[in-house]
Swiss-Prot record:
It comes from the Eukaryota. This is Heat shock protein 60, mitochondrial. GO terms for molecular function: ATP binding; ATP-dependent protein folding chaperone; host cell surface binding; integrin binding. The lineage of its organism: Eukaryota, Fungi, Dikarya, Ascomycota, Pezizomycotina. One of its GO terms (biological process) is response to heat. Gene3D superfamilies: GroEL, GroEL-like equatorial domain, TCP-1-like chaperonin intermediate domain. It is found in: Mitochondrion. It comes from Ajellomyces capsulatus (Darling's disease fungus). Keywords: ATP-binding, Chaperone, Mitochondrion, Nucleotide-binding, Stress response, Transit peptide. May participate in assembly and/or disassembly of proteins imported into the mitochondrion. HSP60 are ATPases and have affinity for unfolded proteins. PANTHER family: 60 KDA HEAT SHOCK PROTEIN, MITOCHONDRIAL (PTHR45633). InterPro entries: Chaperonin_Cpn60_CS, Cpn60/GroEL, Cpn60/GroEL/TCP-1, GroEL-like_apical_dom_sf, GROEL-like_equatorial_sf, TCP-1-like_intermed_sf. The gene is HSP60. NCBIfam families: GroEL (TIGR02348), PRK00013.1 (NF000592), PRK12849.1 (NF009487), PRK12850.1 (NF009488), PRK12851.1 (NF009489).
């Protein structure tokens, strides 16, 4: 019977059998059978989930909190390359922390996001934001465990934060003098008066709207250099143009500048400029509406092969403002702007139509042009022209704002602070403090100052929340939660100085609540007028830290489930090495 089966039947039987993927296919893909399994998730609910998040937040915050205040300690961080890093910068410490437990690490990562966001907006106050976020989340967890509705609690905290911000804005003080600017910078630089004077001098020379950058110096002394230049908020078109991989930026000395009002996509458009760059052996920077297609590919290919140093940047602004900015760059660098309106074709460019500058630095976000070859008379005429348009009564407020920005970039120049030190570790630590101080100073100039040392938040807790009248026990809990949380920065500063934080904070809120400027100088151990003593915080820094911290921490309190990737299961042990399994063949081979 079996022999009578036709070839067709045999084929159908074979085809109906389940097919198996050959093991070699997995091996060729570098995957084991164990790795083909689906990864599962781990979940924690309710109190257990919030407790794990809180533990991670506590661990990270404990590391960051040690840096707060004039007597805060440094943190030593291992580096994957080079020397270990010593720093008091809160966001740097926060980013260095990774926890083994995935649920705890989830909380730590959210706290890292708070610090990073505060750093992006205000440039300082990251440690304060971390302290506040930890305190607010801790209070929220307690209230939720006591039976409060998490969503109502979040809304109540947000309303109380708004009341605190209004109180702080009503009591801020604008800064106008060089001495006040130096005070802000000194406090943010951990009491380093030298750094405070350095930043105030830089701001005095380039103006409050000028550009100040911080670089590593080559000597043991700090230096201040002021050079004429321009900065605009557009970075490199492609990361393939990067020349400094560690700092993720492009740096050229004496580059040629090509300015085009239109989008560049054809290779023929940029060939004359590329040839001029090759002939003169100078880097080339193309600034245009956009560069894409074959033109971009050719530039990247030449850069990767090492045949040509080249980079491309988009023109900042929109519409007529973009044309004006391009004209400003042209005057600054003595470059011809290629535009169809004047029948200036890029493919007909010659070397004398290209601009030149002493140096150019391009990051992902912005570009700084230093020592352009444009004549001072042409730049002065351009500035007068802009001032005339600003003075015109028909110019709108929006246009005036954009014109003021252009004027500052043309006339303000660029100040470069070169941080010196005896070693790379020392320079890195000091540079962190200088950058923080510079950001704090800019924030203070922008929005004003408040008494420092956590004093402003203490007085806001005592007086600013008095206008918020609770109508129920739940609302009272919300207000009490925020009052307890926003006193934490002042308490931490005092405790880092080796004193009893609860006693001093209690005295400030009870005996000195009516005096907004009265606070505690942790460096000297005295109750003083904080503004008169030069102990100040920028309003922008305090406000941003509070808003960012309360937003994330109160939202965390509404979390009911936490989900993470489960740890990978270890596969079975492989066979021992060598040819041990063939030992039984020995007797039959003679």
């Amino acid at each position: 019977m079996q022999r009578a089966l036709s070839s067709t039947s045999r084929a159908s039987v074979l085809s109906s059998a389940p097919t198996r993927a050959p093991v070699s296919r997995f091996r060729s893909a570098g995957l084991s059978l164990q790795q083909q399994r689906f990864a599962h998730k781990e979940l924690k609910f309710g109190v257990e989930g919030r407790a794990a998040l809180l533990k991670g937040i506590d661990t990270l915050a404990k590391a960051v909190c040690t840096t707060l205040g004039p007597k805060g300690r440094n943190v030593l961080i291992e580096s994957s390359y080079g020397s270990p890093k010593i720093t008091k910068d809160g966001v740097t410490v926060a980013k260095a922390v990774t926890l083994q437990d995935k649920f705890e690490n989830l909380g730590a990562r959210l706290l890292q996001d708070v610090a990073s966001k505060t750093n992006e907006v205000a440039g300082d106050g990251t440690t304060t934001a971390t302290v506040l976020a930890r305190a607010i989340f801790s209070e929220t967890v307690k209230n939720v465990a006591a039976g409060c509705n998490p969503m109502d609690l979040r809304r109540g905290i947000q309303a109380a934060v708004e009341a605190v911000v209004e109180y702080l804005q009503a009591n801020k003080r604008d800064i106008t003098t060089t001495e006040e600017i130096a005070q802000v910078a000194t406090i943010s630089a951990n009491g380093d008066t030298h750094v405070g004077k350095l930043i105030s001098n830089a701001m005095e020379k380039v103006g409050k709207e000028g550009v100040i950058t911080v670089k590593d110096g080559k000597t043991i002394e700090d230096e201040l250099e002021v050079t004429e230049g321009m900065r605009f908020d557009r970075g490199y078109v492609s990361p393939y143009f990067i020349t400094d991989t560690k700092a993720q930026k492009v740096e050229f000395e004496k580059p040629l500048i090509v300015l085009s009002e239109k989008k560049i996509s054809a290779v023929q458009d940029i060939i004359p400029a590329l040839e001029a760059s090759t002939t003169l052996r100078r880097p080339l920077v193309i600034i245009a509406e956009d560069i894409e297609g074959e033109a971009l590919a050719v530039c990247i290919l030449n850069k990767l092969r090492g045949q040509l140093q080249v980079a491309a940047v988009k023109v900042p602004g929109f519409g007529d403002n973009r044309k004006s900015i391009l004209g400003d760059i042209g005057i600054l660098t003595n470059a011809t702007v290629f535009t169809d309106e004047l029948d200036m074709k890029l493919e007909k460019a010659t070397a004398d139509m290209l601009g030149s500058t002493g140096s150019i630095t391009i990051t992902k976000e912005d570009t700084i042009i230093l020592n352009g070859d444009g004549s001072k008379d042409s730049i002065a005429q351009r500035c007068e022209q802009i001032r005339g348009v600003i003075a015109d009564p028909t110019t709108s407020d929006y246009e005036k704002e954009k014109l003021q920005e252009r004027l500052a970039k043309l006339s303000g120049g660029v100040a470069v602070i070169k941080v010196g030190g005896a070693s790379e570790v020392e320079v890195g630590e000091k540079k962190d403090r200088v950058v923080d101080a510079l950001n704090a100073t800019r924030a203070a100039v922008e929005e004003g100052i408040l008494p420092g040392g956590g004093t402003a938040l203490l007085k806001a807790a005592a007086n600013g929340l008095a206008s918020v009248k609770p109508t129920s026990s739940d609302q009272l809990r919300r207000i009490s939660s925020l009052v307890s949380a926003i006193t934490r920065p002042a308490r931490t500063i005092v405790e880092n100085a080796g004193l009893e934080g609860s006693v001093i904070v209690g005295k400030l809120t009870d005996e000195h609540a009516s005096d907004f400027n009265r606070g505690f100088d942790s460096a000297k151990g005295e109750y003083v007028d904080m503004i008169a003593s030069g102990i100040v915080d920028p309003l922008k820094v305090v406000r941003t830290a509070l808003v960012d911290a309360s937003g994330v921490a109160s939202l965390l309190g509404t979390t009911e489930v936490a989900i993470v990737e489960a740890p990978e299961e270890k596969g079975p042990a492989g066979p021992p090495g060598g040819m041990g399994g063939m030992g039984g063949m020995g007797g039959g081979m003679f």
